[in-house]
Amino acid sequence: MKKLTALLLSAIMALSLTACGGSEPAPAPEAEDKTVVIGVDDTFAPMGFRDEAGELVGFDIDLANELLGRLGYEPKFQVIDWSMKETELDNGNIDLIWNGYTITESRKEKVNFTQAYLDNKQIIVTMADSDIATKADLAGKTVAVQKESSAYEAVMADAATAATLAGGEPVQFDTNTDAFMDVEAGRSDAIVVDEVLARYYIKLRGEEQYKVLAEDFGSEEYGIGVRKADTEFLAEIDAELTEMINDGTFDEIKGRWFSAQ
């Protein structure tokens, strides 16, 4: 009986070792997810916006499709609350911020940026019949901007001008389109906005209706926002962006949306 028991115990131990040991190959890992979720504001023409058919189009959309496609990724564009973009990135809800995203010192504390790929300015736009001609004329006026935008940062960085505005700061709107509409309705006196968007918008709506002031709130550059931890991904994107600039693809895509530039 003891011998039989010992044999049974030996068999059980052998089976246990076979199941737990390293002699059997480990299961193959699941295929890497190649989808990249990109956070966008779908009202930011011509970088990323809806066409008449409701399709998401624009310079950044074309650029992202080409660049990520070359790297073997599948881009997925996710419309987000632009004021929450860095939070969405940090929480892992999106993988990139890529939609006319201005490089600023405050944003560098939250995200890593690729190289700059497009120049921009924060310009002042009024209706054509406005008596506003200079920054000084904004004193006591209501100035519209997009919420949590680089336009807001640029105005507030000019402390002397910001202090003179009605309310001591710009009025913030969810989108630049909402801000423009408030100016058109006469509730706001001016809008501070990305030149890239403004030139496209006023050309579409009728340039004769608007006035662009000679003064502005400074020059800036657009970059792609990447999570701080994703350093290898950042390098991968940067290298491919450089390749696209060098081989002419970048300029070809840019020409579709900025024919005069």
Residue ranges and their predicted role:
Residues G100-E109, A154-D158, M181-G218:
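A ligand-binding cleft/hinge motif common to bilobed small-molecule-binding domains
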